[in-house]
């Protein structure tokens, strides 16, 4: 099975937060892991906001290593147009709409892993099976 992973789920691998253990278990499956290109910006921005020094450097390195095992959905025109339509129809925040648009490019027969409750609600209304939130 394929799992689309958003930034909220990935961050829990590098920052000890509520449900970090749940996120780790979801990401440790044999599923093909997929994310959008913009996840790089979102995760690195949040790592820099939450960590510093050696912890930041180690987390960034671990993220880069982990990301190399993901399939990446590029934010091309079709993905952005789909995300814009989702945002218009659901009121999703911009980055959430990009995640949902990227995942929708793969169809709805995948797990959508997020710990963002607003995004999870919208993902469910779009027909995704949500894990995490």
Predicted regions, residues:
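Phosphate- and divalent-cation-binding pockets in alpha/beta enzyme and binding domains
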Residues: 22, 42, 82, 121-122
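Histidine- and aromatic-rich ligand-binding microenvironments
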Residues: 5-6, 35, 92-93, 115-116, ...
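Short active-site oxyanion
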Residues: 1, 30-33, 68-71, 107-111
């Amino acid at each position: 099975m394929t799992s689309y992973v958003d930034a909220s789920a990935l961050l829990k691998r590098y920052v000890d937060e509520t449900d970090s253990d749940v996120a780790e278990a979801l990401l440790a499956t044999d599923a093909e892991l997929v994310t959008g290109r913009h996840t790089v910006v979102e995760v690195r921005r949040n790592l820099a906001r939450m960590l510093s020094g050696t912890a930041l450097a180690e987390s960034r390195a671990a993220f880069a290593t982990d990301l190399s095992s993901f399939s990446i959905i590029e934010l091309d025109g079709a993905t952005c147009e789909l995300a814009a339509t989702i945002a218009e129809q659901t009121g999703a925040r911009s980055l959430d709409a990009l995640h949902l648009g990227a995942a929708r490019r793969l169809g709805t027969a995948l797990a959508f892993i997020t710990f963002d409750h607003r995004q999870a609600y919208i993902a469910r209304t779009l027909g995704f099976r949500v894990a995490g939130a």
